[in-house]
Amino acid sequence: MVKLISNSTILLSLFLFSIAAIANAQQCGRQKGGALCSGNLCCSQFGWCGSTPEFCSPSQGCQSRCTGTGGSTPTPSGSAQNVRATYHIYNPQNVGWDLNAVSAYCSTWDANKPLSWRKKYGWTAFCGPVGPRGRDSCGKCLRVTNTRTGAQTTVRIVDQCSNGGLDLDVNVFRQIDTDGNGNHQGHLIVNYQFVDCGDN
């Protein structure tokens, strides 16, 4: 009888532990509108937060805060395919690369960065399906590829948008619109990948 109660207690404890773990699980990524995991955890291909290689390895389909080895140090990561990219006339070269002059959302945090930082990459607004939002996206870099032609470039996020993708500076848009189809349609279809800006 004592052994039966002991086994029942163990099974009940395991059951309650499992329910608690499920209740505390956090969803992220495209399954949760691009949400990031708290505590710098990685977002798995299935939209769950964790810190093991199954969650953090790009080869396992990690969506954000991925690492090369599955450790806990976040690196710029996450990607999306077939995203709409429109253009915005920032023309930063005409305003001295001044984020305040174009009323960019990220100017609150990045307007006083060195000129070399502000002009290192073309500018974009970001509201893509995968990646950080708001202040957390400011200053991050994306490798953007035109799906039609394969032309690609790296851009820096300086603003927000509402088109569900990217709003590239017109100069960047033209740079990857190598066949003119984007200009004709008023948008491009692109893939993007978060990459290290190399700012150190």
UniProtKB/Swiss-Prot annotation:
GO terms (BP aspect): defense response to bacterium; defense response to fungus
Keywords assigned: Chitin-binding, Disulfide bond, Signal
Protein induction: By wounding.
InterPro entries for the chain: Barwin_CS, Barwin_dom, Chitin-bd_1, Chitin-binding_1_CS, Endochitinase-like_sf, PR4, RlpA-like_sf
Keyword Flavoprotein (UniProt): no
Pfam families: Barwin (PF00967), Chitin_bind_1 (PF00187)
Domain Barwin: 78-199
Paired cysteines (S-S): 28-43, 37-49, 42-56, 62-66
Range of residues in the leader sequence: 1-25
Protein name (database record): Wound-induced protein WIN1
Record has Disulfide bond as a keyword: yes
Limits of the Chitin-binding type-1 domain: 26-68
Organism (species): Solanum tuberosum
UniProt GO molecular function: chitin binding; RNA nuclease activity
